Every structure is written in C-alpha cells, then in structure tokens.
Design a protein with these regions (language model features):
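Short loop/turn motifs that connect adjacent beta-strands in outer-membrane beta-barrel proteins
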Residues: 33-43, 74-104, 145-152, 205-218, ...
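Short glycine/proline- and aromatic-enriched beta-strand/turn motifs that initiate or cap beta-hairpins
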Residues: 33-78, 105-111, 115-120, 288-294
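Outer membrane beta-barrel transmembrane domains
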Residues: 45, 118-119, 238, 243-356
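Transmembrane beta-barrel strands of outer-membrane/channel proteins
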Residues: 46-52, 106-114, 155-161, 201, ...
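Sequence/structural signature of outer-membrane beta-barrel proteins
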Residues: 51-55, 115-119, 160-164, 204-208, ...
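Residues that define the transmembrane beta-barrel architecture of outer-membrane proteins
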Residues: 60-66, 132-136, 151, 191-197, ...
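Long, hydrophobic/aromatic-enriched structural stretches that serve as scaffold segments
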Residues: 90-166
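Extracellular loop and loop/strand-boundary signature of outer-membrane beta-barrel proteins
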Residues: 123-128, 181-187, 223, 300-304, ...
Length: 356
C-alpha cells in the first residue's frame, strides 16, 4: 500500500468511526433534552466513556477503551445505596472514610480496554512490539467528599486474555467500519484473573461554588494503584477555565479511579438549570512498577516488552454542561511506555454523563 492509499484509508476509517460515535451519543443527548431540569447532586449519573486512537490517526498500542458506569446520588452512608449498598455498606464504620460531614457516592462500572502492536495485519508474533491484550472488568467505587476535597477507593476485578473478548470486539468494530480484520490475536496474553485496588485524593483550588460567569479552578490529585494488572503511583492536575463551571471535580479519561464526579448536595449552584462550558488542560505522571499489558502474564510465560518506569499523559479538551447532561472531549498525548516503542501515542476520549 502506497502513502496515498494509506492516507485515504485512514481518512475513511476516521469518518466511519466519527459517524459510529455520533450515532451512539445522539440518543443519549436526546434523552437529556427530554428530562426535566434537576440539581445533579440529588440524582444518580450514568456515564459513558469512549476512547480510541482513531482520533490520533493510528491503530496501535492502547487502541480502544469503553466504560459504562452508574454513580449514586449523594448519600449519608454507603449502605443507603439501593444498588450495591449491601457490599459497600461494610465500609461505613471504617474510620478512614471520614465522619458524618462527608457526602458519599457508590459507583458500579463495566469496561473493556484493548491493546495491539503496530501491524495488526501481521499474524506472527513480533518480539519487539507489545503483546495483543484485552482487559474486561467490573468495578465498585466508593467516593467520600467535601466542598474542596474528594477521595475515591476503587476495586476492579476482571479477566485478561481470550476471556476478555478483545479479538471478537475488535473484529466486530473493524467489520462494521469495513476494515480488514486483525490477524495476530492468536499471540495475545493468556487467560488470567485480574484484581486491582486504587485510591485517589483530589482537591479543588480557587473554587467558588456560588460563582457564575467566567471563572477558573485547579484540581490537583495524587493516587496509587496496586494489583496484578497495574501497580503505580500517580501525580497530576487539571486546570479548568470557562463559563459557569460545573460544581464538580472534573471528568477524567478512563483510568483506575474513573468514577463520575457528582456535585455536592449543599451546593448553591444548580448548574443543571443553565448552560455552561469550559476548556481544560490536564497533566498526569505515573511511576510504574507493573503493567501486565507490557510485562506479560503474572503466573506463566508470555510475550512481553521492557516497560519504561515513568509515563506521562498530557490532555487538552473542552466540556459542555446543559440541563442534566455533561459532554466532554479530550485529546490525549501519552509518552512512550516501553523501550523500542516507535512513537508516542495520541488518542481521543469522549465522556457523556446524564443525571437522572
């Protein structure tokens, strides 16, 4: 395939994927417009995350991620949640979850992430490139927060390998878009149960919950993840500037601590009743001790590459909130994750939250 054919194929693929994304989001936005004006803290939030490297005109490395989560309204106790209260309620009396002045949320989620080498048309294993891999998981998140600080504890459990249905998912998408099917999934990581626990603490600086009009705030955070899928420490921050900023803690990309950030019950700014927008810039660094998608299987021999100990993500994006919905898009640049990786990666992230 010459350069012109490659550019034309990439353009066709991107147009098809944008059309598919639009068709997925349109019904959700229609539902948001039909719903009455609400204060989002008093209702739960359904959030769809979609990430794909087609926004960066590539088809490699972290190639696709999707996640659907439900976050409860603000609660006094985790056990008050009708969905997962029986499980989450065991943490109600733990001293490190704060006193009665904290508002709480319970989040449940399901997601899948896929990773591929550079050439998905090559059926052979290429030792210098990352392994084929997929991660299919469910999560339980516990959030306890005050006006200017939010804590998140997240438990993810799932499967890596053929059980994660990465090959089937990628073939389904490629067939829907008229692309050639990937050929190398026979070389993917072997089946393994994955368990991860993540804690994150986030602050809000220069935040005025009663403000309207143009404003800005800054959301620094630290976190740690432990498990056989990922083990790393995280340090990052998000700067927001815009009109009628939502009274929340931002909306990040798919990550170990991604839970929908519902506003505080006591907020005086019911931003669901009005239109707002903002631009944001986010930077995150991770000190990586383990990444199963680079290190390979934990308990058996498998394809692996030499990971880099430090990885950074830089993001630019915008978000719009109106009535009971919030839509955001981020363009994410990720530094090289392993030795010999030909280039850094760029991918896009779309997040849609509907409060009801």
């Amino acid at each position: 395939m010459d350069a012109c054919e490659s550019i034309q194929e990439t353009s066709t693929i991107m147009k098809a994927r944008f059309h598919l994304i639009f068709m997925l989001i349109l019904p959700c936005m229609a539902a948001a417009q039909l719903a009455p004006d609400i204060h989002p803290a008093r209702f739960g939030a359904l959030t769809l995350y979609f990430e794909n490297d087609a926004f960066g005109s590539t088809d490699r490395d972290y190639t696709n991620g999707v996640r659907l989560s439900w976050t409860s309204p603000s609660l006094q106790r985790f056990s008050d949640d009708p969905t997962a209260g029986r499980v989450a309620g065991v943490f109600d009396d733990a001293p490190w979850f704060g006193d009665s002045s904290y508002e709480r949320n319970v989040a449940i989620s399901i997601g899948q992430s896929m990773f591929t080498p550079v050439d998905v048309r090559n059926p052979a294993l290429v030792p210098s490139e990352r392994p084929y891999a997929a991660w299919l998981y469910v999560g339980l998140g516990l959030v306890w927060k005050k006006t200017n600080v939010k804590n998140t504890l997240l438990f993810n459990i799932g499967v890596i390998g053929p059980w994660a249905l990465g090959e089937e998912s990628q073939r389904l998408v490629h067939d829907a878009l008229g692309q050639r099917s990937p050929q190398g999934w026979d070389n993917q990581l072997r089946n393994e149960v994955g368990v991860n626990v993540t804690y994150e603490r986030k602050w809000r600086l220069h935040h005025n919950p009663a403000s309207s009009g143009m404003d800005w705030d800054f959301l620094p955070y630290v976190g740690a993840t432990l498990g056989n899928v990922y083990t790393h420490g995280t340090l990052g921050g998000e700067l927001r500037f815009g009109y009628n900023l939502p009274d929340d803690f931002g909306t990040g990309a798919i990550s170990d601590s991604a839970t929908t950030s519902t506003p505080l019950e006591g907020s005086t700014k019911a931003w669901a009743h009005r239109f707002g927008w903002h631009l944001f810039a986010r930077a995150e660094g991770r000190a990586v001790a383990r990444n199963i998608f680079l290190d390979g299987n934990t308990f058996r021999d498998s394809h692996s590459v030499d990971k880099k100990p430090f990885v950074a993500d830089l993001s630019l994006g915008f978000a719009v909130n109106w009535r009971n919905s919030k839509l955001s898009y981020a363009y994410i640049y990720r530094t090289c994750e392993f030795k010999g990786q030909p280039d850094e990666q760029i991918f896009g992230s779309i997040t849609l939250s509907i409060f009801f």
